[in-house]
Amino acid sequence: MMTWSQMSFSDMNSPIMEQMVFFHDHSMMIILMITILTIYMITNIMMNNLLSRSMMEGQEIEIIWTIIPAITLIFIAIPSLHLLYLTDETFNSQISIKVLGHQWYWSYEYSDFNKEFDSFMIPEPEMMKNSFRLLDTDNNLVIPINTNIKYLISSMDVIHSWTIPSLGIKMDAVPGRLNQSFSISSRPGLYYGQCSEICGANHSFMPISLGVTSMKNFINFINSS
């Protein structure tokens, strides 16, 4: 989860999120090089007094400052397109979970196990000392580690957005439409997200809590009432 004054991404917990962070680092490296070069050129121009009143054009320099940015954009575009297609990649899922957005809570259905429940934010007066304000819920979504999960996401009223940054998932929940997303969680723990689409007065009070655990604990959770 995100912490106070954090400048980087939250902990990665899926292959697609790892690729997103790698692409971010790749892009930042290129941007940093461009920034340093630009500052150097501006400083160099301001510090010297060399002028040429007879120079009307510079064919070579025009070719250079056209080709180099084009090559730079290619180095950014290729991994970006690769990542874009990876986010829409589908694979054979082992477990399907249906996610339904409401004003202002989430409903989860384990279609393979005939289990469903609603998930509400824990009000501040009922919070424990180790709870996180505006993030903890009364019923957490639980999934097993290293398992292909398919999320079927929709809404019962207005447009919501089911988002868990650590998994690299952000999918709109649209009434009358069933969107899908896939993920594999590689680390156990409790991960948080929030609705990322303004959906009314209590938009800020419909968090998402996802617990990633072992298959044994997941089966115990499914069998619990």
From Swiss-Prot:
Subcellular location: Mitochondrion inner membrane
Keywords attached to this entry: Copper, Electron transport, Magnesium, Membrane, Metal-binding, Mitochondrion, Mitochondrion inner membrane, Respiratory chain, Translocase, Transmembrane, Transmembrane helix, Transport
Binding site for Cu cation A1: 160, 195, 199, 206
Protein's UniProt keywords contain Magnesium: yes
SUPFAM superfamilies: Cupredoxins (SSF49503), Cytochrome c oxidase subunit II-like, transmembrane region (SSF81464)
Mitochondrial intermembrane side: 1-26, 83-225
Keyword rRNA processing listed: no
Entry's Gene Ontology BP terms: ATP synthesis coupled electron transport
InterPro entries documented for this protein: CcO_II, CcO_II-like_C, CcO_II_C, Copper_CuA, Cupredoxin, Cyt_c_oxidase_su2, Cyt_c_oxidase_su2_TM_dom, Cyt_c_oxidase_su2_TM_sf
Positions with a binding annotation for Mg(2+): 197
Molecular function GO labels: copper ion binding; cytochrome-c oxidase activity
Enzyme Commission number(s) of this protein: 7.1.1.9
GO cellular component terms listed in the entry, alphabetical order: mitochondrial inner membrane
Needed cofactors: Cu cation
UniProt enzyme class: translocase
Binding site for Cu cation A2: 195, 197, 199, 203
Mitochondrial matrix side: 49-62
TM regions (residue ranges): 27-48, 63-82
Gene3D superfamilies named in the record: 1.10.287.90, Cupredoxins - blue copper proteins (2.60.40.420)
Membrane topology: Multi-pass membrane protein
CC cofactor note: Binds a dinuclear copper A center per subunit.
UniProt-listed NCBIfam families: CoxB
PANTHER family assigned: CYTOCHROME C OXIDASE SUBUNIT 2, CYTOCHROME C OXIDASE, SUBUNIT II
Family: Belongs to the cytochrome c oxidase subunit 2 family.
Assembly: Component of the cytochrome c oxidase (complex IV, CIV), a multisubunit enzyme composed of a catalytic core of 3 subunits and several supernumerary subunits. The complex exists as a monomer or a dimer and forms supercomplexes (SCs) in the inner mitochondrial membrane with ubiquinol-cytochrome c oxidoreductase (cytochrome b-c1 complex, complex III, CIII).
Protein name: Cytochrome c oxidase subunit 2
Organism encoding this protein: Rhipicephalus sanguineus (Brown dog tick)
Gene: COII
